[in-house]
């Protein structure tokens, strides 16, 4: 969501410029020279909203843009659209979905209210570092870094799937999840008093369990063998060594234990037994 007060002398516009992925191991993931390999199509538009259809190889998703105030959406070139407001105050929201949204997306004000409530709960209902009584001259900077890390981990590593190794900051390891790293990214949620954020991701393990059982069977093992480098589908990413690594295997057990310590209930035990 974005809200801005605009100048008539310097009108601002919002660019929607879509790249093709590089497929690189470690880069910004943006290939701006491959417009022939993907497309962006305006499939609907009215005075206050528009829907773009994105197609990359076998993947399709939709970008819904909604704005308040007069504005014009124009196509500048392939995969490049610009939204230009004509009023002095302008707000808009943007939503990315696998299908066309069946209901209107939230307005700027609605997103602002939800976001404000979320962060108020995050900072007041969990733990936070306080080194104000420390006499070491480094204490203030250390506290700043700890609190900043709590924020950065919350915005990048608390989704419905495991985060990639560098979160949303950068594209590394082809943008894949590395399940041995999920402990470092997410164990801290339960320890800071936010077990619900950890639980949000752990449900992903249930959806990919059948694939993990197939991996174990293929390799001659009983039970489950969690994939090392993967994506939302749970399939193994190509790797010379990834399929043979085992350091990601115990993480789910320990993370489930953290959830139980935060909420020792029979219901949680039954859900984890599944």
Residue locations for each model-derived region?
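Conserved small/polar residues in nucleotide/adenosyl-binding loops
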Residues: 273-274
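The substrate-binding groove and active-site-proximal loops of carbohydrate-active enzymes
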Residues: 128-136, 171-176, 238-243, 258-270
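Acidic/polar, glycine-enriched structural segments that form the non-catalytic walls/loops
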Residues: 1-176, 195, 205-213
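Core alpha/beta catalytic barrel or barrel-like domain that forms the active/cofactor pocket
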Residues: 219-222, 245-258
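Acidic/His metal-coordination segments adjacent to aromatic residues that form catalytic metal sites
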Residues: 162-175, 226-242
């Amino acid at each position: 969501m974005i809200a801005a007060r605009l100048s008539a002398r310097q009108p601002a516009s919002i660019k929607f410029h879509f790249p093709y992925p590089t497929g690189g191991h470690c880069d910004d993931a943006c290939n701006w020279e491959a417009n022939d390999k993907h497309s962006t199509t305006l499939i609907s538009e009215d005075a206050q909203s528009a829907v773009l259809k994105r197609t990359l190889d076998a993947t399709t998703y939709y970008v819904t843009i909604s704005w308040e105030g007069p504005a014009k959406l124009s196509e500048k070139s392939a995969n490049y659209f610009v939204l230009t407001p004509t009023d002095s105050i302008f707000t808009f929201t943007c939503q990315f979905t696998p299908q066309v949204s069946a209901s209107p997306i939230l307005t700027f004000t609605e997103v602002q209210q939800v976001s404000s409530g979320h962060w108020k709960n995050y900072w007041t209902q969990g733990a936070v570092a306080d080194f104000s009584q420390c006499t070491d001259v480094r204490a203030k900077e250390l506290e700043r870094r700890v609190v900043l890390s709590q924020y950065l981990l919350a915005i990048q590593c608390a989704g419905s799937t495991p985060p990639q190794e560098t979160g949303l900051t950068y594209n590394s390891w082809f943008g894949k999840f590395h399940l041995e790293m999920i402990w470092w990214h997410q164990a801290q949620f339960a320890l800071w008093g936010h077990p619900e954020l950890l639980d949000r991701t752990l449900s992903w393990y249930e959806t990919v369990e059948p694939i993990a059982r197939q991996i174990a069977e293929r390799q001659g093992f009983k039970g489950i063998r969690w994939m090392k480098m993967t994506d939302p589908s749970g399939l193994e990413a190509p790797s010379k060594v990834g399929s043979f690594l085992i350091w990601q295997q115990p993480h789910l057990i320990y993370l489930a234990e953290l959830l139980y310590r935060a909420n020792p209930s029979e219901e949680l035990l039954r859900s984890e037994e599944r």
